[in-house]
């Protein structure tokens, strides 16, 4: 089968002829229709320090996808051949305390599809049936293929009550932009998103942000004054991993504010903890999606009218995958879809 593999420990991704994956008794065999390129895939492509420590070589990469069930193990229940599915990319152990307590997104033994084991950038994928999520008929393949990162946005945004609240999002990558759309959809008052990438900030405007702020050109405090905000942000969503962005968030949070953190800093990050203490801030780390509550919320948000389609800016046939990676690496894109049909 065709597959995109991290074939060598150097920059790049390569098209290979890989063996079709073998299916176990509790697995689904999925024929891939569409995949999306994630920021993680760009880290793997670039072969940065994290990738060198984490990624086995060679390995088929990719974890954002939609496909069709074409076969299943003899123990599988609840799925049929022909079902359209996406899937949770974190394969959990099932026996640690968090798994047994129903907090599977906090499994200490998680194995990542396309990170620790062969992934979805291939004509076929095998995953445990437990990890698959049926896609409702009224949700398109394009949207289903980005459910993984959309789930990061939903999990982060819905960590705290948003109705009537003022929200600051630092980092206008695709996940931050989708989080802005979620916040507005569920009833936040002002949703302000910051970055220095004008292309991404314009996308954020299209997706419903109250204000998309280029912090290289204007001050966050000035924007707050413009919006009539006198007490600071109630909720912060840190999506960038950039220390200066987080420092700005701490400075502009209201007392008693709540911060959900998804962005991963490149190294240790010093902060002024006195601001956290004296403002009584609550910090929550976010990893992945809640299994599977986030997935049901994603489908329901779209079915209730949330439109995240503007975040998809590029489509390429799989044979043109290099153009897709080039678009993502340029920073002048939203989500990039690779078509396998």
Curated annotation (Swiss-Prot):
Chemical reaction(s) catalysed: L-threonine + NAD(+) = (2S)-2-amino-3-oxobutanoate + NADH + H(+)
Family per similarity comment: Belongs to the zinc-containing alcohol dehydrogenase family.
Binding annotation for NAD(+): 175, 195, 200, 262-264, 286-287
UniProt: Zn(2+) 2 binding residues: 93, 96, 99, 107
Pathway: Amino-acid degradation; L-threonine degradation via oxydo-reductase pathway; glycine from L-threonine: step 1/2
GO molecular function, one term: L-threonine 3-dehydrogenase activity
Binding site for Zn(2+) 1: 38, 63-64
HAMAP family documented for this protein: Thr_dehydrog (MF_00627)
The record's free-text note on cofactor binding: Binds 2 Zn(2+) ions per subunit.
Main location, first listed in the record: cytoplasm
Signal sequence annotation: none
Organism of provenance: Shewanella sediminis (strain HAW-EB3)
Record bears the keyword Cytoplasm: yes
UniProt-annotated catalytic positions: 40, 43
Protein role: Catalyzes the NAD(+)-dependent oxidation of L-threonine to 2-amino-3-ketobutyrate.
Essential cofactor(s): Zn(2+)
Keyword annotations of the record: Cytoplasm, Metal-binding, NAD, Oxidoreductase, Zinc
Gene3D superfamilies, per database record: Medium-chain alcohol dehydrogenases, catalytic domain, NAD(P)-binding Rossmann-like Domain
GO CC terms of this entry: cytoplasm
Positions of the record's site feature: Important for catalytic activity for the proton relay mechanism but does not participate directly in the coordination of zinc atom: 148
Protein name: L-threonine 3-dehydrogenase
Gene Ontology annotations of biological process type: L-threonine catabolic process to glycine
Assembly, per entry: Homotetramer.
């Amino acid at each position: 089968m065709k597959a995109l593999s991290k074939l060598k420990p150097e920059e790049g991704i390569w098209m290979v002829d890989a063996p079709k994956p073998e299916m176990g008794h509790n697995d689904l065999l999925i024929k891939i229709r569409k995949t999306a390129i994630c920021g993680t895939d760009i880290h793997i492509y670039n072969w940065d320090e994290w990738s060198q420590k984490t990624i086995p070589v060679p390995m088929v990469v990719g974890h954002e996808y939609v496909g069709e069930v074409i076969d299943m193990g003899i123990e599988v229940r609840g799925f049929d051949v022909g079902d359209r599915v996406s899937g949770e990319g974190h394969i959990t152990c099932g026996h640690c305390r968090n798994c047994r307590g129903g907090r599977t997104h906090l499994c200490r033994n998680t194995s990542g599809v396309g990170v620790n084991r062969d992934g979805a950038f291939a004509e076929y994928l095998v995953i445990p049936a437990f990890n698959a999520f049926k896609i409702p008929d009224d949700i398109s393949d394009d949207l289903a293929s980005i459910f993984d990162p959309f789930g990061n946005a939903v999990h982060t945004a819905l960590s705290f009550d948003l109705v009537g609240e003022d929200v600051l999002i630092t980092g206008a990558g695709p996940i931050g932009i989708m989080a802005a759309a979620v916040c507005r959809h569920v009833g936040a008052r002002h949703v302000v998103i910051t970055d220095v990438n004008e292309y991404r900030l314009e996308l954020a405007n299209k997706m419903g942000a109250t204000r998309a702020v280029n912090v290289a050109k204007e001050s966050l405090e000035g924007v707050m004054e413009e919006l009539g905000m006198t007490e600071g942000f109630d909720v912060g969503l840190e999506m960038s991993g950039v220390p200066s962005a987080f420092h700005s968030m701490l400075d502009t949070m209201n007392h008693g504010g709540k911060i959900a953190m998804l962005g991963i800093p490149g190294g240790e990050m010093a902060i002024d903890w006195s601001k956290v203490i004296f403002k009584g801030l609550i910090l929550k780390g976010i990893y992945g999606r809640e299994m599977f509550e986030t997935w049901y919320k994603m489908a329901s948000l779209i079915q209730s009218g949330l439109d995240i389609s503007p975040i998809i800016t590029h489509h390429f046939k799989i044979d043109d995958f290099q153009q897709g990676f080039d678009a993502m690496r340029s920073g002048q894109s939203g989500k990039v879809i690779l078509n396998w049909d």
